Regions:
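Enriched for short, Lys/Arg-rich terminal
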Residues: 70-107
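Basic, Lys/Arg-enriched alpha-helical interface segments
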Residues: 1-64
Length: 107
């Protein structure tokens, strides 16, 4: 089993995504459900993180960035085998071009 660490940007992504649903779309119940769904999906990564595919982008895959899915969102993460830790990097809507955001991160 792996330890899961959320990077600050991933936490901020979850807040931004749920705030948008709650306040812009005026659906606070849906936002709460979304937040809980993100947390549950991320918690499950600790058991078998390698079952998730590497990103289809060659540069991201070369950096061993993997992704999981929840609804219309991708959860990007990196596995550090030395410490048995999964680092959740970003939680982004599928329409967001994640590549520049992920390549600018220090791994």
């Amino acid at each position: 089993m792996y330890k899961v660490m959320m990077l600050p940007m991933a936490e901020e992504d979850i807040m931004n995504n749920t705030d948008y649903i709650a306040f812009e779309k005026k659906a606070p119940e849906t936002a709460l459900e979304l937040a809980m769904g993100f947390r549950n999906t991320i918690a499950k990564i600790e058991f078998m993180p390698k079952q998730h595919e590497l990103d289809e982008d060659e540069e991201l895959a070369a950096r061993e960035i993997r992704k999981g899915y929840y609804k219309n969102y991708k959860i990007y993460f990196f596995i550090d085998e030395r410490s048995s830790t999964v680092y959740v990097l970003r939680v982004l809507h599928m329409l967001v071009n994640a590549k520049p955001l992920l390549l600018n991160m220090r791994l």
